[in-house]
Protein backbone atom coordinates (compact mmCIF):
# COMPACT_ATOMS: atom_id res chain seq x y z
CA UNK A 1 0.00 0.00 0.00
CA UNK A 2 1.28 3.45 -0.87
CA UNK A 3 2.42 5.58 2.02
CA UNK A 4 2.32 8.79 0.02
CA UNK A 5 -0.31 11.45 0.45
CA UNK A 6 -3.13 11.82 -2.03
CA UNK A 7 -5.63 14.30 -3.37
CA UNK A 8 -7.10 16.70 -0.86
CA UNK A 9 -10.82 16.20 -0.40
CA UNK A 10 -13.12 18.97 0.81
CA UNK A 11 -13.88 16.90 3.90
CA UNK A 12 -10.17 16.68 4.67
CA UNK A 13 -9.62 20.39 5.22
CA UNK A 14 -8.71 19.83 8.86
CA UNK A 15 -7.18 16.36 8.76
CA UNK A 16 -4.39 14.28 7.28
CA UNK A 17 -4.11 13.99 3.49
CA UNK A 18 -5.17 10.53 2.37
CA UNK A 19 -3.97 8.41 -0.57
CA UNK A 20 -5.48 8.52 -4.04
CA UNK A 21 -4.42 6.91 -7.30
CA UNK A 22 -6.08 9.27 -9.77
CA UNK A 23 -4.34 12.04 -11.67
CA UNK A 24 -5.82 14.43 -14.23
CA UNK A 25 -2.52 15.28 -15.91
CA UNK A 26 -3.56 15.60 -19.59
CA UNK A 27 -1.87 13.12 -21.91
CA UNK A 28 -1.84 13.40 -25.69
CA UNK A 29 -3.57 10.38 -27.21
CA UNK A 30 -3.86 9.78 -30.96
CA UNK A 31 -7.54 9.94 -31.87
CA UNK A 32 -9.15 7.25 -33.98
CA UNK A 33 -12.46 7.14 -35.81
CA UNK A 34 -13.96 5.11 -32.98
CA UNK A 35 -12.59 7.22 -30.14
CA UNK A 36 -15.05 8.70 -27.70
CA UNK A 37 -14.83 12.01 -25.91
CA UNK A 38 -15.13 12.54 -22.19
CA UNK A 39 -13.28 9.40 -21.14
CA UNK A 40 -11.55 9.48 -17.76
CA UNK A 41 -7.90 8.51 -17.74
CA UNK A 42 -6.80 6.64 -14.61
CA UNK A 43 -3.14 6.03 -13.77
CA UNK A 44 -2.62 2.45 -12.65
CA UNK A 45 -0.04 1.22 -10.16
CA UNK A 46 1.95 -0.67 -12.81
CA UNK A 47 2.64 2.45 -14.84
CA UNK A 48 -0.02 2.48 -17.55
CA UNK A 49 -3.32 4.29 -17.81
CA UNK A 50 -6.72 3.02 -18.82
CA UNK A 51 -9.72 4.60 -20.47
CA UNK A 52 -12.65 3.93 -18.17
CA UNK A 53 -15.65 4.48 -20.48
CA UNK A 54 -14.87 1.81 -23.05
CA UNK A 55 -13.66 -0.86 -20.68
CA UNK A 56 -10.21 -1.67 -19.39
CA UNK A 57 -8.20 -1.06 -22.55
CA UNK A 58 -4.46 -1.07 -22.04
CA UNK A 59 -2.94 2.00 -23.65
CA UNK A 60 0.57 3.25 -24.21
CA UNK A 61 2.62 3.51 -21.05
CA UNK A 62 2.62 7.00 -19.56
CA UNK A 63 5.19 8.41 -17.20
CA UNK A 64 4.41 11.34 -14.96
CA UNK A 65 7.40 13.03 -13.40
CA UNK A 66 7.75 15.36 -10.46
CA UNK A 67 8.05 18.25 -12.89
CA UNK A 68 4.68 17.25 -14.36
CA UNK A 69 3.22 17.45 -10.87
CA UNK A 70 4.72 20.83 -10.17
CA UNK A 71 3.50 22.20 -13.50
CA UNK A 72 0.00 20.77 -13.15
CA UNK A 73 -2.87 22.75 -11.66
CA UNK A 74 -5.16 19.76 -11.32
CA UNK A 75 -4.71 19.08 -7.62
CA UNK A 76 -5.22 21.93 -5.17
CA UNK A 77 -2.17 20.99 -3.09
CA UNK A 78 1.10 19.21 -3.78
CA UNK A 79 -0.43 15.89 -2.76
CA UNK A 80 0.60 14.44 -6.13
CA UNK A 81 3.45 12.79 -4.24
CA UNK A 82 1.62 9.50 -4.87
CA UNK A 83 3.53 9.59 -8.18
CA UNK A 84 6.97 10.10 -6.71
CA UNK A 85 9.41 7.31 -7.39
CA UNK A 86 12.75 8.95 -6.68
CA UNK A 87 11.73 10.13 -3.21
CA UNK A 88 11.23 6.93 -1.27
CA UNK A 89 12.96 4.60 1.14
CA UNK A 90 13.24 2.03 -1.67
CA UNK A 91 15.21 4.46 -3.83
CA UNK A 92 17.35 5.45 -0.84
CA UNK A 93 18.23 1.86 0.00
CA UNK A 94 19.03 1.21 -3.67
CA UNK A 95 21.49 4.13 -3.70
CA UNK A 96 23.10 2.91 -0.47
CA UNK A 97 23.53 -0.62 -1.88
CA UNK A 98 25.03 0.66 -5.12
CA UNK A 99 27.41 2.93 -3.22
CA UNK A 100 28.56 0.01 -1.08
CA UNK A 101 29.30 -2.01 -4.24
CA UNK A 102 31.38 0.83 -5.67
CA UNK A 103 33.33 1.10 -2.40
CA UNK A 104 34.06 -2.62 -2.58
CA UNK A 105 35.69 -2.18 -5.99
CA UNK A 106 38.08 0.41 -4.56
CA UNK A 107 37.12 3.00 -7.18
CA UNK A 108 36.91 5.84 -4.66
CA UNK A 109 36.49 8.49 -7.37
CA UNK A 110 33.02 7.08 -8.04
CA UNK A 111 32.00 6.73 -4.40
CA UNK A 112 29.36 9.19 -3.24
CA UNK A 113 29.43 10.83 0.17
CA UNK A 114 26.05 10.13 1.80
CA UNK A 115 24.77 12.92 4.06
CA UNK A 116 21.61 12.74 6.17
CA UNK A 117 19.87 15.78 7.68
CA UNK A 118 17.20 15.17 10.33
CA UNK A 119 14.59 17.81 11.18
CA UNK A 120 13.37 18.32 14.75
CA UNK A 121 9.74 17.25 14.24
CA UNK A 122 10.59 13.72 12.98
CA UNK A 123 12.98 13.32 15.90
CA UNK A 124 10.15 14.06 18.33
CA UNK A 125 7.74 11.79 16.47
CA UNK A 126 10.19 8.90 16.58
CA UNK A 127 11.18 9.70 20.18
CA UNK A 128 7.54 9.31 21.20
CA UNK A 129 7.20 6.12 19.15
CA UNK A 130 10.22 4.45 20.75
CA UNK A 131 9.92 6.04 24.20
CA UNK A 132 13.28 7.81 24.08
CA UNK A 133 14.39 11.37 24.71
CA UNK A 134 14.93 13.61 21.70
CA UNK A 135 18.72 13.50 22.12
CA UNK A 136 18.72 9.70 22.55
CA UNK A 137 16.60 9.38 19.42
CA UNK A 138 19.00 11.56 17.44
CA UNK A 139 22.01 9.50 18.54
CA UNK A 140 20.38 6.12 17.87
CA UNK A 141 19.19 7.31 14.46
CA UNK A 142 22.72 8.45 13.68
CA UNK A 143 24.00 5.00 14.59
CA UNK A 144 21.31 3.28 12.53
CA UNK A 145 21.92 5.41 9.45
CA UNK A 146 25.68 4.89 9.70
CA UNK A 147 25.09 1.13 9.80
CA UNK A 148 23.43 1.55 6.39
CA UNK A 149 26.50 3.26 4.96
CA UNK A 150 25.76 6.92 5.67
CA UNK A 151 28.86 9.11 6.11
CA UNK A 152 27.47 12.21 7.88
CA UNK A 153 24.35 12.68 10.00
CA UNK A 154 23.37 16.30 10.67
CA UNK A 155 20.62 18.24 12.43
CA UNK A 156 18.81 21.21 10.90
CA UNK A 157 19.67 23.68 13.67
CA UNK A 158 21.98 25.92 11.63
CA UNK A 159 19.54 26.02 8.69
CA UNK A 160 16.62 26.75 11.03
CA UNK A 161 18.62 29.63 12.50
CA UNK A 162 19.58 31.04 9.11
CA UNK A 163 15.97 30.84 7.86
CA UNK A 164 14.78 32.87 10.86
CA UNK A 165 17.54 35.46 10.48
CA UNK A 166 16.80 35.93 6.78
CA UNK A 167 13.05 36.01 7.27
CA UNK A 168 13.21 38.58 10.07
CA UNK A 169 15.38 40.88 7.97
CA UNK A 170 13.13 40.41 4.95
CA UNK A 171 10.11 41.38 7.04
CA UNK A 172 11.71 44.55 8.39
CA UNK A 173 12.75 45.62 4.88
CA UNK A 174 9.26 44.97 3.51
CA UNK A 175 7.63 46.83 6.39
CA UNK A 176 9.78 49.88 5.83
CA UNK A 177 9.04 49.81 2.10
CA UNK A 178 5.30 49.20 2.41
CA UNK A 179 3.89 48.50 5.84
CA UNK A 180 0.45 47.78 4.35
CA UNK A 181 1.59 44.66 2.47
CA UNK A 182 1.09 41.48 4.48
CA UNK A 183 4.04 39.06 4.46
CA UNK A 184 3.24 35.34 4.53
CA UNK A 185 5.73 32.69 5.61
CA UNK A 186 7.35 30.45 3.00
CA UNK A 187 8.68 27.39 4.82
CA UNK A 188 5.65 25.12 4.21
CA UNK A 189 5.76 23.56 0.71
CA UNK A 190 2.14 22.43 0.87
CA UNK A 191 1.05 26.03 1.37
CA UNK A 192 3.42 27.37 -1.32
CA UNK A 193 2.30 24.81 -3.92
CA UNK A 194 -1.36 25.52 -3.11
CA UNK A 195 -0.72 29.25 -3.51
CA UNK A 196 1.02 28.80 -6.86
CA UNK A 197 -1.66 26.54 -8.27
CA UNK A 198 -4.83 28.03 -6.86
CA UNK A 199 -4.23 31.76 -6.36
CA UNK A 200 -1.20 32.39 -8.56
CA UNK A 201 -0.10 35.94 -9.25
CA UNK A 202 -2.51 37.42 -6.72
CA UNK A 203 -0.99 35.74 -3.67
CA UNK A 204 2.68 35.21 -4.63
CA UNK A 205 3.85 38.80 -3.90
CA UNK A 206 2.76 38.30 -0.29
CA UNK A 207 4.94 35.23 0.28
CA UNK A 208 8.41 35.63 1.78
CA UNK A 209 11.28 34.71 -0.52
CA UNK A 210 13.38 33.14 2.24
CA UNK A 211 14.04 29.47 1.54
CA UNK A 212 12.82 26.79 3.91
CA UNK A 213 15.34 25.24 6.33
CA UNK A 214 15.38 22.08 4.20
CA UNK A 215 16.53 23.97 1.12
CA UNK A 216 18.98 26.14 3.05
CA UNK A 217 20.44 22.93 4.40
CA UNK A 218 20.68 21.66 0.84
CA UNK A 219 22.83 24.64 -0.14
CA UNK A 220 25.04 24.25 2.93
CA UNK A 221 25.61 20.55 2.28
CA UNK A 222 26.14 20.68 -1.50
CA UNK A 223 28.33 23.78 -1.43
CA UNK A 224 29.76 24.67 1.98
CA UNK A 225 30.29 21.10 3.22
CA UNK A 226 31.52 20.06 -0.23
CA UNK A 227 34.17 22.79 -0.06
CA UNK A 228 35.27 21.57 3.36
CA UNK A 229 35.49 17.99 2.10
CA UNK A 230 37.21 19.14 -1.12
CA UNK A 231 34.79 17.25 -3.35
CA UNK A 232 32.26 18.46 -5.95
CA UNK A 233 28.71 18.82 -4.74
CA UNK A 234 27.60 16.26 -7.33
CA UNK A 235 29.53 13.61 -5.37
CA UNK A 236 27.30 14.17 -2.34
CA UNK A 237 23.98 12.36 -2.03
CA UNK A 238 21.92 14.45 0.38
CA UNK A 239 18.94 12.93 2.19
CA UNK A 240 16.61 14.78 4.55
CA UNK A 241 14.22 13.30 7.12
CA UNK A 242 11.08 15.46 7.23
CA UNK A 243 7.59 15.45 8.82
CA UNK A 244 5.53 15.75 5.62
CA UNK A 245 5.37 14.33 2.11
CA UNK A 246 5.22 17.74 0.45
CA UNK A 247 8.90 18.22 1.31
CA UNK A 248 9.57 15.66 -1.42
CA UNK A 249 8.01 17.94 -4.03
CA UNK A 250 9.81 20.96 -2.62
CA UNK A 251 13.16 19.23 -3.04
CA UNK A 252 12.23 18.47 -6.66
CA UNK A 253 11.60 22.07 -7.71
CA UNK A 254 13.89 23.23 -10.50
CA UNK A 255 14.57 26.35 -8.42
CA UNK A 256 16.65 24.08 -6.18
CA UNK A 257 18.63 22.41 -8.94
CA UNK A 258 22.26 23.54 -9.15
CA UNK A 259 23.60 23.91 -12.68
CA UNK A 260 27.11 24.09 -11.22
CA UNK A 261 26.82 20.78 -9.36
CA UNK A 262 24.42 19.27 -11.89
CA UNK A 263 22.34 17.95 -9.01
CA UNK A 264 19.56 18.94 -6.67
CA UNK A 265 20.38 20.51 -3.32
CA UNK A 266 18.37 17.71 -1.69
CA UNK A 267 18.47 14.41 -3.56
CA UNK A 268 15.99 12.42 -1.52
CA UNK A 269 13.44 13.11 1.21
CA UNK A 270 12.16 10.41 3.53
CA UNK A 271 9.63 10.93 6.27
CA UNK A 272 9.10 9.92 9.89
CA UNK A 273 6.71 7.14 8.96
CA UNK A 274 9.12 5.84 6.31
CA UNK A 275 11.95 5.69 8.86
CA UNK A 276 9.61 3.75 11.15
CA UNK A 277 8.88 1.39 8.25
CA UNK A 278 12.61 0.89 7.61
CA UNK A 279 13.14 0.03 11.28
CA UNK A 280 10.18 -2.37 11.23
CA UNK A 281 11.62 -4.16 8.20
CA UNK A 282 14.95 -4.37 10.04
CA UNK A 283 13.06 -6.10 12.88
CA UNK A 284 14.94 -4.13 15.52
CA UNK A 285 13.77 -1.33 17.74
CA UNK A 286 15.54 2.00 17.38
CA UNK A 287 17.07 1.68 20.86
CA UNK A 288 18.74 -1.59 19.81
CA UNK A 289 20.91 0.25 17.30
CA UNK A 290 24.23 1.57 18.53
CA UNK A 291 24.15 5.24 19.50
CA UNK A 292 26.44 7.66 17.70
CA UNK A 293 26.99 11.42 17.88
CA UNK A 294 25.58 13.63 15.15
CA UNK A 295 28.16 15.44 13.04
CA UNK A 296 28.76 19.19 13.26
CA UNK A 297 30.98 20.21 10.33
CA UNK A 298 30.15 23.93 10.40
CA UNK A 299 32.55 25.09 13.10
CA UNK A 300 35.11 23.68 15.50
CA UNK A 301 32.94 24.29 18.55
CA UNK A 302 29.95 21.97 18.76
CA UNK A 303 26.69 23.28 20.25
CA UNK A 304 25.73 21.88 23.63
CA UNK A 305 22.73 20.10 22.10
CA UNK A 306 21.79 18.86 18.64
CA UNK A 307 18.02 19.08 19.10
CA UNK A 308 16.58 22.56 19.63
CA UNK A 309 13.28 24.39 19.70
CA UNK A 310 12.68 27.79 18.15
CA UNK A 311 10.27 29.83 20.27
CA UNK A 312 7.04 28.19 21.44
CA UNK A 313 5.37 27.42 18.12
CA UNK A 314 5.94 23.99 16.62
CA UNK A 315 6.75 24.98 13.03
CA UNK A 316 9.98 26.92 13.39
CA UNK A 317 8.84 29.85 15.53
CA UNK A 318 8.55 32.33 12.66
CA UNK A 319 5.69 34.43 14.03
CA UNK A 320 7.13 34.76 17.53
CA UNK A 321 10.72 35.32 16.52
CA UNK A 322 9.97 37.89 13.81
CA UNK A 323 7.48 39.70 16.05
CA UNK A 324 10.11 40.15 18.78
CA UNK A 325 12.79 41.24 16.31
CA UNK A 326 10.51 43.70 14.50
CA UNK A 327 9.25 45.21 17.76
CA UNK A 328 12.82 45.95 18.81
CA UNK A 329 14.20 46.92 15.38
CA UNK A 330 11.29 49.09 14.22
CA UNK A 331 9.87 50.51 17.46
CA UNK A 332 12.56 49.92 20.10
CA UNK A 333 10.09 47.84 22.10
CA UNK A 334 11.11 44.72 24.02
CA UNK A 335 8.21 42.21 24.15
CA UNK A 336 8.12 39.62 26.97
CA UNK A 337 10.10 36.43 26.53
CA UNK A 338 6.90 34.39 26.27
CA UNK A 339 4.36 35.90 23.89
CA UNK A 340 0.64 35.40 24.43
CA UNK A 341 -1.33 34.83 21.24
CA UNK A 342 -5.09 35.36 21.25
CA UNK A 343 -7.08 32.40 19.92
CA UNK A 344 -9.69 33.31 17.32
CA UNK A 345 -12.01 30.78 15.62
CA UNK A 346 -9.98 27.78 16.75
CA UNK A 347 -6.62 26.83 18.24
CA UNK A 348 -5.08 26.90 14.76
CA UNK A 349 -5.82 30.57 14.16
CA UNK A 350 -4.21 32.96 16.63
CA UNK A 351 -3.03 36.55 16.57
CA UNK A 352 -0.93 39.03 18.54
CA UNK A 353 -0.43 42.77 18.21
CA UNK A 354 1.87 45.53 19.43
CA UNK A 355 0.34 48.83 20.48
CA UNK A 356 2.28 52.08 20.56
CA UNK A 357 0.85 55.57 21.11
CA UNK A 358 -2.69 54.12 20.98
CA UNK A 359 -2.02 52.66 17.55
CA UNK A 360 -1.57 49.06 16.42
CA UNK A 361 1.87 49.10 14.83
CA UNK A 362 2.37 45.33 14.48
CA UNK A 363 -0.25 42.63 14.05
CA UNK A 364 0.84 39.03 13.49
CA UNK A 365 -1.11 35.79 13.12
CA UNK A 366 -0.60 32.03 12.93
CA UNK A 367 -2.84 30.15 10.48
CA UNK A 368 -2.56 26.35 10.44
CA UNK A 369 -4.64 24.01 8.29
CA UNK A 370 -6.27 24.61 4.92
CA UNK A 371 -9.55 25.78 6.39
CA UNK A 372 -7.80 28.71 8.06
CA UNK A 373 -5.57 29.29 5.03
CA UNK A 374 -8.60 29.60 2.77
CA UNK A 375 -10.23 32.06 5.15
CA UNK A 376 -7.00 34.08 5.25
CA UNK A 377 -6.70 34.21 1.46
CA UNK A 378 -10.31 35.31 1.10
CA UNK A 379 -9.68 38.11 3.60
CA UNK A 380 -6.70 39.24 1.58
CA UNK A 381 -8.77 39.21 -1.60
CA UNK A 382 -11.45 41.32 0.08
CA UNK A 383 -8.83 43.70 1.43
CA UNK A 384 -9.50 42.74 5.05
CA UNK A 385 -6.41 40.62 5.58
CA UNK A 386 -4.09 43.60 5.14
CA UNK A 387 -4.52 44.34 8.84
CA UNK A 388 -1.96 41.58 9.45
CA UNK A 389 1.66 42.49 8.88
CA UNK A 390 2.89 38.88 9.03
CA UNK A 391 1.18 35.49 9.05
CA UNK A 392 2.90 32.18 9.79
CA UNK A 393 1.12 29.78 7.42
CA UNK A 394 1.27 25.98 7.69
CA UNK A 395 -0.86 23.53 5.74
CA UNK A 396 -1.21 20.97 8.52
CA UNK A 397 -3.47 21.53 11.55
CA UNK A 398 -1.20 22.20 14.57
CA UNK A 399 1.68 22.86 12.17
CA UNK A 400 4.71 20.74 11.34
CA UNK A 401 4.55 18.70 14.54
CA UNK A 402 1.38 17.17 13.06
CA UNK A 403 2.82 16.74 9.58
CA UNK A 404 1.05 14.28 7.31
CA UNK A 405 4.01 11.88 7.41
CA UNK A 406 4.62 11.81 11.15
CA UNK A 407 4.32 8.44 12.91
CA UNK A 408 0.65 7.51 13.20
CA UNK A 409 -1.22 7.38 16.54
CA UNK A 410 -1.45 4.01 18.24
CA UNK A 411 -4.75 2.13 18.23
CA UNK A 412 -7.34 4.04 20.21
CA UNK A 413 -5.27 7.23 20.38
CA UNK A 414 -6.67 10.41 18.84
CA UNK A 415 -4.50 12.60 16.63
CA UNK A 416 -4.96 15.60 18.93
CA UNK A 417 -3.83 13.57 21.94
CA UNK A 418 -0.65 12.53 20.13
CA UNK A 419 -0.05 16.11 18.98
CA UNK A 420 -0.34 17.40 22.55
CA UNK A 421 2.19 14.81 23.73
CA UNK A 422 4.61 15.89 20.99
CA UNK A 423 4.07 19.51 21.99
CA UNK A 424 5.14 18.64 25.54
CA UNK A 425 8.32 17.02 24.22
CA UNK A 426 9.03 20.11 22.12
CA UNK A 427 8.66 22.45 25.10
CA UNK A 428 11.35 20.52 26.97
CA UNK A 429 13.98 21.20 24.30
CA UNK A 430 16.57 23.96 24.77
CA UNK A 431 15.64 27.11 22.87
CA UNK A 432 17.95 28.25 20.09
CA UNK A 433 18.98 31.87 19.61
CA UNK A 434 19.52 32.21 15.85
CA UNK A 435 22.02 35.05 16.01
CA UNK A 436 24.88 32.92 17.32
CA UNK A 437 28.54 32.18 16.66
CA UNK A 438 27.73 29.37 14.20
CA UNK A 439 25.50 31.43 11.91
CA UNK A 440 27.93 34.35 12.06
CA UNK A 441 30.72 32.04 10.92
CA UNK A 442 28.66 30.78 7.96
CA UNK A 443 27.79 34.33 6.92
CA UNK A 444 31.46 35.28 7.12
CA UNK A 445 33.17 32.22 5.63
CA UNK A 446 30.59 31.01 3.12
CA UNK A 447 28.05 33.74 2.26
CA UNK A 448 30.43 36.74 2.10
CA UNK A 449 28.41 38.35 4.90
CA UNK A 450 24.71 38.99 5.43
CA UNK A 451 22.63 40.92 2.84
CA UNK A 452 25.18 40.16 0.12
CA UNK A 453 24.51 39.03 -3.44
CA UNK A 454 25.66 35.53 -2.52
CA UNK A 455 23.45 35.25 0.56
CA UNK A 456 20.46 36.56 -1.39
CA UNK A 457 21.07 34.06 -4.18
CA UNK A 458 21.57 31.03 -1.94
CA UNK A 459 19.10 31.74 0.88
CA UNK A 460 16.17 33.08 -1.14
CA UNK A 461 13.99 31.76 -3.96
CA UNK A 462 11.14 32.71 -6.28
CA UNK A 463 7.66 31.37 -7.01
CA UNK A 464 5.74 30.60 -10.18
CA UNK A 465 2.04 30.89 -10.86
CA UNK A 466 0.79 27.67 -12.45
CA UNK A 467 -1.44 28.18 -15.47
CA UNK A 468 -4.90 26.70 -15.07
CA UNK A 469 -5.67 23.64 -17.15
CA UNK A 470 -8.28 23.97 -19.87
CA UNK A 471 -9.64 20.67 -18.55
CA UNK A 472 -10.25 22.06 -15.08
CA UNK A 473 -13.86 20.82 -15.09
CA UNK A 474 -12.51 17.27 -15.00
CA UNK A 475 -10.87 17.77 -11.62
CA UNK A 476 -12.04 15.26 -9.04
CA UNK A 477 -12.79 16.91 -5.68
Swiss-Prot record:
Recall the GO molecular function terms of this protein's record: 4 iron, 4 sulfur cluster binding; metal ion binding
Disulfide bridge map: none
The residues the record assigns to binding [4Fe-4S] cluster 1 are 23, 69, 72, 75
Q: Which SMART domains match?
A: Fe_hyd_SSU
Q: Where along the sequence do coiled-coil regions lie? A: none
Q: Where is the signal peptide?
A: none
* InterPro entries per record: Cytosolic_Fe-S_CAF, Fe_hydrogenase, Fe_hydrogenase_lsu_C, Fe_hydrogenase_ssu
Concerning SUPFAM superfamilies, the annotation shows: Fe-only hydrogenase (SSF53920)
Q: Which example biological process does GO assign this protein?
A: iron-sulfur cluster assembly
> Which keywords has UniProt assigned to this entry?
4Fe-4S, Iron, Iron-sulfur, Metal-binding
Q: Which domain of life is it from?
A: Eukaryota
Family named by the database record:
Belongs to the NARF family.
Its function?
A: Component of the cytosolic iron-sulfur (Fe/S) protein assembly machinery. Required for maturation of extramitochondrial Fe/S proteins.
Please identify the protein, giving its name as recorded: Probable cytosolic Fe-S cluster assembly factor GL21135
Amino acid sequence: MSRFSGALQLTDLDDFITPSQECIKPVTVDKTATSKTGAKITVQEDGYYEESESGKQKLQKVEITLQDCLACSGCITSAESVLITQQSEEELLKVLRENAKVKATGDMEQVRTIVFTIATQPLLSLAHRYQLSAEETARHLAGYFRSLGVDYVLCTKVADDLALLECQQEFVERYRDNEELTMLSSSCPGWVCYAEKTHGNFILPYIATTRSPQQIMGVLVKQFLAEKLNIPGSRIYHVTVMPCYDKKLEASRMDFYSEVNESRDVDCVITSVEVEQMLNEDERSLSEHEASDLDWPWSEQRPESMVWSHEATLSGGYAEHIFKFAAKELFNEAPPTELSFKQLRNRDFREISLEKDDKTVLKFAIANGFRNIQNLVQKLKRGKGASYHFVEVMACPSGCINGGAQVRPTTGQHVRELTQQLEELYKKLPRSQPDNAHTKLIYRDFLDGSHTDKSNELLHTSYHAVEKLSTALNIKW
